[in-house]
Regions:
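Polar, glycine-rich mid-to-C-terminal structural blocks
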Residues: 75, 127-135, 144-221
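Alpha-to-beta junction loops
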Residues: 103-115
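Conserved small-residue motifs centered on glycine
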Residues: 178-313
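Histidine-centered catalytic/metal-binding microenvironments
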Residues: 310-353
Length: 353
C-alpha cells in the first residue's frame, strides 16, 4: 500500500511537491462540506465528519465538529498548508479551481467517492495512472458514515383524506419504473420519475458478479450472462478492449465512460474494492441522527455552518490559534444554536433507545 496513515500520506504529498512540482499536492477546497474536494473528506482520517452526530461513549450524541477528532484533523491540515502541500490560494479555492488544478497536473492525491474515476479523472486516464487506496486513518479512528441517506421528503397536508396514497404511488413508481423497468436494452434510464429508486447493493452486486465471471472467462471472450443488467453487459463488452489499453495505452482508443467505470467499479484494485477493504476491517461508524431537521437546526443551522467554515479556514491558514481559540470556538458554537440543537437531537435519540 502506498500510504496507511496520515503521516505516510504527508510523505507522499511531499514527493509530489519535490519530484513532480505539484503546487497543490492535495485536492482540497475551502468548502468544508457538501461537494467534491471538501474539507470534511480529509477530516475523516481522524474520525471527524462535521454536521454529523456521534455517540460519545456515554450514550449521548455530540456534534462531530466540536470533538477532539476535529481538533486533530485541523492540526494536520494546518501543517500541510504550512509545508506548502495545499494550494497557496487555498482560501479562495472552490471545487472548480481544485478541479482545474487536478487537470493541470498540479495535484497528486484526491479523496473522493468511488465514482471519482468517472469525474473528474476520466479525461486524465489516457495519459496518467491513478491508483485507489482506502482512506488512511489515524490509529483508532473510524470513518463516520450516514446511517440513513435521505435526500428528499414528501409531505402530505393534514387535511388529505387519503394520505396513504402517497406511499402507494411511490411503491408503484418503484414497481413499474424502478430497478428492473429502467434497464433498457441498449442502456439504462437514469430517472423516469421524480422518485428515484437507488439500490444500495447494486454497485457491490455488479463488482462481485463481474469478478466471479472473470474467474471463468478472464478476458471476457464470451457473451455476458443474459440475466445481467444492461450496464454490466456494457462493461463486459468493453473489457477486452480495456485489457488491450491497460497493456499498451496506445493500442486502442480510450473509451472514457466504460474504461473509467471498469477501473473504479470492477477492478480488484479499484475504488470500490478500496471501500470494501474499509468495511472488511470495520473501520467505520455511523452518524446516529437521521431524523427530520429539528426546529433549532432550521433556525440556526446556517449561522452554525458559517461559524464552522470561518473557523476551520482561519485555523488552516494559521490566522487563528487552534490551542488557545478552540474552547472559544466550541463555546460560540453552543451559543449560536448548538446547545439547543444538541438538546433536541438527544431527546430524539433517547426515544429510539
Amino acid at each position: 500500500m502506498l500510504f496507511r496513515s496520515p503521516k505516510e500520506l504527508k510523505n507522499v504529498l511531499k514527493v509530489f511537491k519535490e519530484k513532480k512540482g505539484a503546487s497543490a499536492s492535495l485536492a482540497l477546497s475551502k468548502s468544508y462540506k457538501g461537494s467534491y474536494f471538501t474539507i470534511d473528506r480529509y477530516m475523516q482520517m481522524f474520525g471527524s465528519n462535521p454536521f454529523t452526530w456521534v455517540n460519545d461513549g456515554s450514550g449521548k450524541l455530540v456534534a462531530s465538529e466540536t470533538t477532539d477528532n476535529t481538533k486533530k484533523a485541523l492540526t494536520y491540515l494546518r501543517a500541510l498548508y504550512s509545508e506548502g502541500l495545499l494550494a497557496p490560494d487555498f482560501a479562495s479555492s472552490d471545487p472548480s479551481i481544485v478541479e482545474s488544478n487536478i487537470k493541470q497536473g498540479k495535484t497528486g492525491v484526491i479523496f473522493g467517492p468511488w465514482w471519482q474515476y468517472e469525474y473528474p479523472l476520466a479525461d486524465l486516464l489516457p495519459t496518467q495512472d491513478w491508483l485507489s487506496f482506502p482512506i488512511p486513518l489515524e490509529e483508532g479512528a473510524k470513518i463516520v458514515l450516514p446511517r440513513q441517506q435521505i435526500q428528499y421528503y414528501y409531505v402530505v397536508l393534514k387535511t388529505c383524506a387519503y394520505p396513504e396514497a402517497l406511499m402507494k404511488m411511490i411503491n408503484l413508481y418503484i414497481e413499474l419504473d424502478g430497478k428492473e423497468g429502467a434497464r433498457a436494452e441498449d442502456g439504462y434510464v437514469w430517472s423516469w420519475v421524480p422518485t428515484q429508486f437507488y439500490d444500495p447493493y447494486d454497485i457491490d452486486t455488479q463488482y462481485t458478479t463481474i469478478n466471479e465471471q472473470l474467474k471463468i472467462d478472464p478476458k471476457a471472450e464470451n457473451e455476458a450472462p443474459a440475466e445481467w443488467s444492461a450496464h454490466a453487459k456494457k462493461l463486459w463488452k468493453a473489457y477486452p478492449n480495456y485489457l488491450k489499453w491497460k497493456e499498451d495505452h496506445g493500442a486502442v482508443k480510450f473509451e472514457a465512460n466504460t474504461f473509467a467505470n471498469i477501473i473504479g467499479r470492477v477492478n480488484e484494485d479499484g475504488a470500490w474494492a478500496a471501500i470494501k477493504q474499509t468495511k472488511a476491517k470495520d473501520q467505520f461508524t455511523y452518524n446516529e441522527f437521521y431524523g427530520l431537521p429539528t426546529e433549532s437546526q432550521n433556525l440556526y443551522g446556517g449561522q452554525m455552518s458559517t461559524h464552522c467554515e470561518k473557523f476551520f479556514t482561519k485555523v488552516i491558514l494559521k490566522e487563528a490559534n487552534l490551542e488557545s481559540d478552540w474552547d472559544n470556538f466550541v463555546s460560540e458554537w453552543n451559543s449560536s444554536g448548538g446547545k439547543e440543537c444538541s438538546e433536541e437531537i438527544n431527546a430524539w435519540y433517547a426515544e429510539r433507545k
